[in-house]
From Swiss-Prot:
It comes from Cryptomeria japonica. The keyword Signal applies. It comes from the Eukaryota. This is Pathogenesis-related thaumatin-like protein 3.7. Belongs to the thaumatin family.
Length: 231
């Protein structure tokens, strides 16, 4: 027969299990804020999209356990009342509310929630090029807040420059060496082009294999996040 202490232990274990399940099934809050002097049309997969004038914010709740997700900013957009239109950079199939990834060049805030080791993984990426400065800011002050604050467009070489952004070398030249694929999938080094990005934004991914200095973690369930354009 179970004793009172046995029942108490079972009750505590049950409450812990329920709490962990609720935490995993809950949502993580992201707040996107535009501090740029121009309008940014924020986008997220998941999330959709929202026009943000200077100083405006957009709250987005993302299910815990979401993997391979991203936020980005679009510029030079024009949409009609139905939410159809075009953007100069970051366009997502001509939709205000994005259901697909944005076109290059685009600065990305990438993340995975509740990944390996019960950690959130996040990074600022210039692998798809650069269009808007941004930062990822965990509300947990013990976790690092990576940022790309520089105007990379000002340092963009002519071969990579487009209206409103700076393409990656992979996008422009489509070689295995620049794209870290084929014969270079396991042997990919920084290029003179990716080093321009790295020098401007040391905390951001500058090419596909730039993991060691550009991926950050925070214990899952301990934080929400803000994404700031022009931090």
């Amino acid at each position: 027969m179970a004793t009172v202490s046995d029942l108490a232990l079972l009750l505590v274990a049950g409450l812990v299990a329920i709490s962990l399940h609720m935490q995993e099934a809950g949502a993580v809050k992201f707040e996107l804020k535009n501090q740029c002097e121009y309008t940014v049309w924020a986008a997220g997969l998941p999330g959709g999209g929202q026009q943000l004038d200077q100083g405006q914010t957009w709250p987005v709740e993302v299910p815990a356990g979401t993997k391979g997700a991203r936020f980005w900013g679009r510029t030079g957009c024009s949409f009609d009342a139905s939410g159809r239109g075009t953007c100069k950079t970051g366009d997502c199939n001509s939709q205000l509310s994005c259901q697909v990834s944005g076109g290059v060049p685009t600065t990305l805030a990438e993340y995975t929630l509740n990944g390996d080791g019960n950690k959130d993984f996040y990074d600022v990426s210039l692998v798809d090029g650069f269009n808007v400065p941004l930062s990822i800011n965990p509300t947990n002050s013990q976790c690092f807040a990576p940022a790309c604050k520089a105007d990379v467009n000002a340092a963009c070489p002519a071969q990579l420059k487009v209206d409103g952004g700076c393409n990656s070398a992979c996008t422009v030249f489509q070689t295995d060496e620049y794209c870290c694929r084929g014969t270079h999938v396991d042997n990919c080094s920084p290029s003179s082009y990716s080093m321009i990005f790295k020098n401007q934004c040391p905390q951001a991914y500058s090419y596909a294999k730039d993991d060691s200095s550009s991926t950050f973690t925070c214990p899952s369930g301990t934080t929400d996040y803000s994404i700031v354009f022009c931090p």
